[in-house]
């Protein structure tokens, strides 16, 4: 899903490297969030407050930077995944609404964010992300999509019985369908972009759980710090292949 160049947009080129880095970043955020809330035993609320502060600081730096910078951009993406992980776990477990309840709630918030963005700015295409207003909507929407992805990944892998390997296959298959739609249909590329962006999050979440969950539950039982190191290394490798020139997906 890559198209024409837009020098004004503050998002990276939507290439294969973009999607690989996105998945690696979401896996890093999943394991990082779990490391703080579980391994360090700080709890979901404290973890959410910590990562929310980091997320807000990263967004401020990203918005105040007047041109696209891949280091700032991908750090902000990782920040959205960590706060998304802890926020989803807080909603699902601490508030007791469960994976399905969390998925429904977060889906509603995501749709509302996209609708308000569309009504306010006239478009949700990423090549329009070139002002404080559009960037603010962009990062709020991404944060909701990352949070939804955590709940959706946990719901399919745990509650629905797919397991981690089954969840990985499910979301890879869904992304393959989106790719085919981008190649052989006239469906809006903006719609397909956001669909793919949303679904890469539960894929990253399931991969993260697969790395650090016990073998008895279908995981590899890596330590959360080891899984985070693995994810960071993978994210850094694909990040270097990310093109600096932004691109339109509309």
Regions found by a protein language model. Give the residues of each.
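Polytopic alpha-helical membrane proteins, predominantly small-molecule transporters/carriers
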Residues: 1-250
